């Protein structure tokens, strides 16, 4: 199954970019601490979702969360990404005993190459802040509703915090300096807007987990079907 929707940023992930992406989250103390906080939120989200046994990690990127997902001994992990280079990098970079637990799958979040109700949970970290168009988010959420039997765990940037306010100010200054529209592939989304999109797609919000409340833009949502 091939996706009819192509986003410009997704085309950049060749082998070199995939390797850079893997190394990025290990570069410096601040990034390592940020990763630890990401892991804390991910563990809590998985617990709230009932420690699902069959998880689709989409997009899996360079497998950053595979060791965490593999902490549950009997969990089956499908590591999926639109980029073949990302999957290859993940399989080469992550510990062999972890990779042995993962079923690789090259597929798009816009058209997931899996049957209906085929996984317990979809684990979607660091994708939705790249999706600026509501129609595109709705397509992904429709696929998540189709493929997941029970839950979705996803992260994105939301408004209502200091970092979002500061980013908006910086973007206003940049746009004032140039008459051309700069390409943008990261978006701060109004929480009210995305939460309505979740409900419209047939999900209820079980929990909201903020990276740093009132300061950071990152938020993890735990969504349940029905």
Predicted regions and their residues:
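A conserved beta-strand element that flanks and buttresses the S-adenosyl-L-methionine
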Residues: 123
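Class I SAM-dependent methyltransferase "Motif I" SAM/SAH-binding loop
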Residues: 59-61
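A short glycine-rich, Lys/Arg-flanked "PGG" loop and its adjoining helix->strand segment in the class I
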Residues: 138-150
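Conserved class I S-adenosyl-L-methionine
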Residues: 1-49
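Conserved beta-strand signature within the Rossmann-like core of class I S-adenosyl-L-methionine
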Residues: 149-157
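Class I SAM-dependent methyltransferase SAM/SAH-binding core
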Residues: 64-110
């Amino acid at each position: 199954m091939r996706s009819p929707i192509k986003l410009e940023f997704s085309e950049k992930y060749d082998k070199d970019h995939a390797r850079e992406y893997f190394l990025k989250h290990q570069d410096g103390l601040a990034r390592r601490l940020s990763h630890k906080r990401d892991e804390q939120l991910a563990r809590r989200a998985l617990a709230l979702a009932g420690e699902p046994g069959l998880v689709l990690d989409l997009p899996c990127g360079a497998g950053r969360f595979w060791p965490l997902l593999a902490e549950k001994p009997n969990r089956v992990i499908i590591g999926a990404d639109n980029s073949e280079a990302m999957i290859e990098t993940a399989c080469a970079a992550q510990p062999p005993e972890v990779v042995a637990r993962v079923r690789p799958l090259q597929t798009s979040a816009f058209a997931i190459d899996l049957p209906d109700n085929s996984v317990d949970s979809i684990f979607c970290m660091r994708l939705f802040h790249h999706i600026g168009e509501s129609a595109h988010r709705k397509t992904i959420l429709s696929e998540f509703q189709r493929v997941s039997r029970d839950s979705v765990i996803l992260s994105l940037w939301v408004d209502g915090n200091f970092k979002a306010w500061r980013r908006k100010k910086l973007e206003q200054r940049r746009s004032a300096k140039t008459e051309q529209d700069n390409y943008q592939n990261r978006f701060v989304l109004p929480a009210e807007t995305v939460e309505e999109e979740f409900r419209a797609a047939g999900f209820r919000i079980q929990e909201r987990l903020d990276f740093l409340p009132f300061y950071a833009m990152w938020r993890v949502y735990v969504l349940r079907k029905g």
